[in-house]
A protein has these predicted regions:
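Feature captures hydrophobic
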Residues: 1-153
Length: 153
């Protein structure tokens, strides 16, 4: 047995400094508010995002939830845009295990695929729709965070 201290990474119940936690909450909250606008904008500007939006089709509803935090975001795909719709029943739910994990993904410090492999979040819904949402999010995240090490592969 090694006497090396175990890494705290991956521990869901870890605590962060209160000020950093506040900044993370604000950052993630702002991105959740902007999510329908960003998804609509990229569905117009990016051919790949447009193809994924067309694949998902009108009526598809995505819900993003973060365990331990009372904010969720539900967006519905209409013919050419994404709109916020709290009352819609989600087709696919992405559930982050905690705020730190959501922040890591939304700040570009880890890719969506790596976060899924590390179980930062779970998905509930049809796999084909989950893959399409992953591609759509990758277009958005890579545009903003292409300069980050995790997206320079």
């Amino acid at each position: 047995m090694s006497n090396k201290p175990q890494s705290k990474r991956g521990t869901v119940t870890r605590h962060t400094h209160p000020q950093r936690s506040f900044v993370k909450r604000v950052y993630v909250a702002v991105l959740l508010v902007l999510l329908p606008l960003l998804m609509s904008l990229f569905s117009v500007l990016s051919k790949r995002a447009r193809n994924e939006t067309q694949y998902l089709r009108s009526g598809f509803t995505l819900k993003i939830a973060i365990t331990g935090w009372n904010r969720t975001k539900t967006v519905r795909c209409s013919s050419k845009s994404w709109i916020s719709d709290k009352k819609a029943t989600p087709t696919l739910t992405i559930g982050f295990r905690d705020l730190d994990y959501a922040f890591d993904v939304f700040s570009g410090s880890i890719t969506l695929q790596d976060a899924l492999a590390a179980r930062y979040f779970t998905t509930h819904g049809p796999n084909d729709k989950g893959v399409a949402v992953t591609y759509l999010f990758n277009v958005i995240l890579k545009t903003f965070f292409g300069w980050r090490k995790s997206y320079r592969r």
